[in-house]
C-alpha cells in the first residue's frame, strides 16, 4: 500500500483535509504520537440527516465535520498514538459513502466538551459549593449560572438537563432535580468555584459530580453513512458529542479494542449513546472494548418502523414518526419489507422493493413487487434487509443511566462474555421494538445471551418486552437462548419476558417474570 505521512500540528484542519484529498485507493496515512488540533473554522459545514439525532422541530441541523472522508476506498488512517483534539462544537469524523476504511491507533479529545461538570465540595443548609471541571467554562450573570458551550455561547439554565454521578462514576443517573435551574442565586468562588443557594437544603452528597447538557444532538462523534467494511480499532474516545459512533445504512462494521471512557478528572465520555447502529446490514462486531460515562445507552441496534399512510397499487407512501429520525432513506432496490400490525408488531405480509425515494423531509415512497392484500387498521413497514448479524463479546459496560444494550435486530445476534456494572432503573439488556414512541424495529429471530456477568442491576436484568397492546398475546420475538450468565447483587427478576416463543433459558423460574414463551 502507498504510504502517506502527516506530522502533529496545532492547527491542522485545512492541511489534513488536503492530505486526505491526495490519497489514492490502497494507501495508508501514517500519523505519529503527538497532538493534532482541529478547529471549527476549518470544518466542512453542511446540513445532514442523522438517525435519532435530528431536530424534533423538522429543522435539519448543519453539521460541522472536522475530519471528512467522502467516497474513499481501501485506505487506513493509522494514528500510532496520535491525539486528535477538537476546538469548538464539531463532529470529529464523518465517513460518507466510503468502502474498506480502517481507523486505528488514535484518541479523540475536546478542549471544551458539550457536557459541563461540577463536583459538590460541601453543603451547609440551603447552600452548596461546587468545583467546576477545568474544561467546563461558565459565567455568572444576574445571579444565575450559565455554562458556556464549546463555541463560548452561554446555555440558558432552562435548556440544560442534569445527571448526577458518584465520584468514581459507576453510579451515574439522570436527575429530575436540576441545581442550575433550582438555584435562587449563584456566585463565583475563585477561578472555578461555584456557590449556589436554594430555597431548601441541597439533596446531593459531597463528592458527587453533576453533569449538564443541552440535549440537542446537533453534532455527533464518528458517523458512518452508506459505507461498507468499516473498521475502528484501538481508538480511545475521551468525549463524543451527540451519538458517539453512529452508523446508518452501512454494512460490514467491525469495532475492536475501543476505550470510550472520560478524561481523568471527568465523568462523562459520551453526550448520549456510545454506539448507535441504525438500519445497517451485513455483519456488526463489537469486541474487547470498554465503555464508561455515557448519558444514554452504551449500545443501541435497531431498524425503523415507518407508518404506512396510503397504498396506490404497488406504490406505498410512508412517514417517519419518531421526531429525531427523518430525512434518511433506509431502503434499497431489492430489499425485502414486511407489512406489520402496529399494535401487535406481527409481520403480516412480505414484498420486495422495486424502487425507493424520499418525499420531502418526513416521507418515503416505495414501489413494491405487488400490492399488500389486507392492510390492518394501523400499519407500519419494516425493512427485513436492513438488520445486521450482531456479535458483542468481551466488553465492559459501566457508568450509564439507561439500558446497557438495546437490541432489536432480526439478524443472527449474540451477546457473549461481557461484564455489565449497572445501577439504574432500566434493564441491562433490552429486547424491545415499538411502533408508538421510538419506532425502533423489530422482532428478534435468533439471539444468544451467554457467559455474561451482571452486577448491581436495580431492575430486571434482561427484558424481552416489545411495546405491544396490553391485550396482545401474539409472538414478536423468537428463538432466544439465555445460558451461563452470572448475576451479582441484582434486583428481581433476572428476566422479564412476554410475546416470545422458542425461549431456552437456564435462569431459575423463581427469578423470571412473565411467560417463558410458547
PLM region descriptions:
Residues 30, 68, 76-78, 85, ...:
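Extracellular beta-strand solenoid repeats
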Residues 63, 86, 110-112, 121, ...:
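Ser/Thr/Gly-rich low-complexity blocks that favor extended beta-strand/coil architectures
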Residues 27, 34, 65, 73-75, ...:
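The right-handed parallel beta-helix/beta-solenoid scaffold, focusing on the short coil/turn
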Residues 40, 86-92, 112-116, 218-221, ...:
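Short glycine/acidic-rich loop motifs that flank beta-strands on beta-rich extracellular proteins
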Residues 106, 235, 258, 289, ...:
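Consensus "Asn ladder" position of solenoid repeat domains
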Residues 172-217, 349-350, 354-390, 398-399:
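Small/polar beta-strand repeat architecture
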Amino acid at each position: 500500500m502507498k504510504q502517506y505521512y502527516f506530522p502533529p500540528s496545532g492547527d491542522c484542519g485545512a492541511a489534513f483535509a488536503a492530505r486526505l484529498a491526495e490519497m489514492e485507493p490502497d494507501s495508508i496515512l501514517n500519523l505519529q504520537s503527538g497532538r493534532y488540533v482541529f478547529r471549527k473554522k476549518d470544518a466542512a459545514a453542511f446540513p445532514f440527516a442523522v438517525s435519532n439525532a435530528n431536530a424534533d422541530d423538522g429543522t435539519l441541523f448543519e453539521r460541522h465535520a472536522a475530519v471528512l472522508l467522502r467516497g474513499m476506498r481501501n485506505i487506513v488512517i493509522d494514528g500510532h498514538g496520535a491525539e486528535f483534539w477538537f476546538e469548538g462544537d464539531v463532529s470529529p469524523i464523518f465517513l460518507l459513502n466510503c468502502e474498506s476504511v480502517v481507523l486505528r491507533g488514535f484518541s479523540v479529545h475536546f478542549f471544551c466538551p458539550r457536557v459541563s461538570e461540577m463536583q459538590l465540595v460541601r453543603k451547609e443548609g440551603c447552600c452548596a459549593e461546587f468545583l467546576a471541571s477545568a474544561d467546563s467554562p461558565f459565567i455568572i450573570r444576574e445571579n444565575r449560572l450559565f455554562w458556556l458551550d464549546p463555541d463560548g455561547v452561554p446555555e440558558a439554565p432552562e435548556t440544560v438537563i442534569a445527571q448526577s454521578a458518584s465520584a468514581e462514576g459507576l453510579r451515574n443517573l439522570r436527575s429530575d432535580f436540576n441545581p442550575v435551574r433550582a438555584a435562587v442565586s449563584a456566585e463565583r468562588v475563585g477561578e472555578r468555584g461555584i456557590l449556589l443557594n436554594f430555597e431548601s437544603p441541597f439533596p446531593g452528597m459531597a463528592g458527587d459530580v453533576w453533569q449538564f447538557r443541552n440535549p440537542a444532538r446537533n453534532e455527533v462523534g464518528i458517523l458512518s453513512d452508506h459505507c461498507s467494511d468499516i473498521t475502528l480499532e484501538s481508538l480511545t474516545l475521551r468525549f463524543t458529542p451527540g451519538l458517539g459512533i453512529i452508523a446508518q445504512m452501512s454494512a460490514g462494521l467491525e469495532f475492536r479494542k475501543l476505550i470510550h471512557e472520560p478524561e481523568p478528572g471527568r465523568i462523562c465520555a459520551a453526550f448520549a449513546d456510545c454506539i448507535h447502529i441504525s438500519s445497517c446490514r451485513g455483519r456488526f462486531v463489537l469486541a474487547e472494548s470498554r465503555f464508561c460515562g455515557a448519558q444514554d445507552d452504551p449500545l443501541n441496534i435497531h431498524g425503523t418502523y415507518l407508518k404506512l399512510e396510503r397504498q396506490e397499487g404497488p406504490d406505498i407512501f410512508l412517514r417517519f414518526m419518531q421526531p429525531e429520525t427523518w430525512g434518511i432513506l433506509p431502503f434499497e432496490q431489492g430489499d425485502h419489507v414486511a407489512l406489520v400490525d402496529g399494535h401487535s408488531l406481527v409481520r403480516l405480509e412480505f414484498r420486495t422493493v422495486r424502487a425507493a425515494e424520499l418525499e420531502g423531509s418526513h416521507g418515503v415512497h416505495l414501489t413494491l413487487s405487488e400490492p399488500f392484500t389486507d392492510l390492518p387498521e394501523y400499519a407500519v413497514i419494516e425493512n427485513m434487509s436492513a438488520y445486521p448479524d450482531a456479535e458483542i463479546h468481551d466488553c465492559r459496560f459501566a457508568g450509564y443511566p439507561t439500558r446497557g444494550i438495546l437490541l432489536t435486530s432480526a439478524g443472527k445476534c449474540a451477546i457473549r462474555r461481557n461484564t455489565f456494572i449497572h445501577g439504574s432503573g432500566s434493564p441491562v439488556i433490552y429486547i424491545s421494538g415499538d411502533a408508538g414512541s421510538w419506532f425502533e424495529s423489530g422482532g428478534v429471530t435468533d439471539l444468544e445471551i451467554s457467559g455474561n456477568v451482571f452486577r448491581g442491576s436495580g431492575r430486571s436484568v434482561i427484558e424481552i418486552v416489545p411495546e405491544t397492546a396490553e391485550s396482545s398475546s401474539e409472538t414478536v420475538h423468537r428463538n432466544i437462548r439465555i445460558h451461563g450468565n452470572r448475576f451479582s447483587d441484582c434486583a428481581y427478576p433476572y428476566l422479564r419476558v412476554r410475546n416470545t416463543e422458542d425461549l431456552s433459558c437456564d435462569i431459575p423460574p423463581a427469578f423470571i417474570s412473565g411467560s417463558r414463551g410458547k
